């Protein structure tokens, strides 16, 4: 009851008249029916959304990544078609849905029309991203890098290839993947 009083908005969707119909349809779906912020927006101490809208959030032992225009930790470098493919099939050449996101695809987004999925893509790509940047690389001769290279070669190259580009529709590309570069790669 208290959470509803503080955070629940019992009001109809109001379109942004400065945006086109497709953007507003995307906003309606993201903010309402698909409720993306429930997982992808960090919460405050009493469970309300923080101002970091769609900029990623920890959910128990899962991390829901940033889904904004940030080109490093978000989906800003994805094309609208890659977003549509991800939401429809659960994978594209950049990422593979797993955990709660796989459930969202299986139970919800795969059933949306291509037009609705494209509207979601347009809306998400318009959202301001966090100020997170790509972390600084360690020197190649650093012991941690050598150990990581060995672990990758032994455990990852069969599916993700030696250059990290993956196999389309089977193993996601790890190169420049926001889920890997983001603040929490546990998912």
Locate each region found by the language model.
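Post-cleavage N-terminal segment of exported redox proteins
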Residues: 1-20, 62, 81-146
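Sequence/structural segment immediately N-terminal to covalent heme-attachment motifs in c-type
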Residues: 2-5, 14, 18-44, 49-56, ...
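Generic structural signal for individual residues within well-ordered alpha-helical segments
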Residues: 24-27, 84, 118, 175
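Short, electropositive, low-hydrophobicity segments enriched in small/polar residues
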Residues: 30, 94, 170
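Gly/Gly-Pro-rich "capping" loops immediately C-terminal to redox-active cysteine motifs
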Residues: 43-81, 100-113, 166-187
């Amino acid at each position: 009851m208290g959470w509803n009083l503080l955070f629940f908005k019992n009001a109809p969707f109001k379109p942004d008249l400065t945006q086109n119909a497709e953007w507003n349809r995307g906003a309606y779906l993201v903010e309402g029916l698909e409720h993306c912020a429930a997982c992808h927006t960090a919460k405050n101490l009493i469970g309300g959304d923080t101002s970091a809208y769609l900029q990623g959030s920890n959910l128990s032992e899962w991390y829901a990544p940033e889904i904004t225009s940030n080109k490093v930790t978000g989906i800003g470098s994805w094309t609208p078609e890659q977003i549509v493919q991800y939401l429809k099939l659960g994978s594209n050449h950049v990422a593979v849905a797993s955990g709660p996101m796989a459930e969202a695809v299986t139970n919800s987004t795969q059933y949306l029309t291509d037009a609705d999925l494209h509207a979601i893509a347009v809306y998400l790509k318009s959202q301001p991203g966090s100020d997170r940047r790509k972390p600084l690389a360690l020197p190649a001769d650093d012991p941690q890098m050598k150990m990581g290279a060995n672990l990758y070669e032994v455990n990852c190259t069969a599916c993700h290839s030696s250059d990290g580009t993956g196999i389309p529709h089977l193993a996601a590309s790890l190169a420049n993947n926001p889920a890997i570069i983001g603040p929490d790669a546990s998912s």
